[in-house]
Amino acid sequence: TKKIGKSGLNRKQIHHSFPEYVLPEDLDEKGWWNKDAESLSELSERVSRVINTLKDRAEENIRIGLVAHGGFFSSFLCTLFNLKPAEGTAFQTYNCSISQITFEKREKIVIQYLNQYDYLPKNLRVSRPKCDI
């Protein structure tokens, strides 16, 4: 089943809500997204690029914050653990949960914690209803 992408906020809508933002010139009234949803193979390629970038920067002794949707993060963890998301493996995460993963060296990855959400008030703790992968 082909997933159809939606346009997202357009230039006018973003500027109205966030007038201080500097927007890219190519963002127009059609919105910031103009493609269909990415395929599983496209997602896997994007996840691999991100992981390789993090590994390449592992010894810089810096902190990098990664904000991602649940599907991306599930694929990210599957890739780290050499699991195949297409074969039914998925990590379900709470909305706004935080995880700390340290890339100490290119081939040494330490997971301090995953999917913590206890900092959120109970009324804001909402899990993903289903895993799409």
Could you say what each language-model-derived stretch is?
Residues I62-G70:
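Generic beta-sheet signal
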Residues K3, D36, L40-L43, G65-L66:
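Aromatic-acidic/polar surface patches that form glycan- and anion
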Residues K6, S39-V47, T93:
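Soluble or luminal CAZymes and related metallo-dependent hydrolases
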Residues T1-G5, D28, S48-N52:
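Short charge-dense sequence patches
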Residues T1-E20, D56, E60-I62, C78-I133:
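Acidic, low-complexity terminal tails and accessory targeting/binding regions
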Residues H16-E42:
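Short glycine/proline- and acidic residue-enriched helix-loop micro-motifs
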Residues H15, S44, S48-D56:
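Generic structural signal for well-ordered alpha-helical scaffold segments
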Residues F72-S74:
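Short, active-site-adjacent cap segments at secondary-structure transitions
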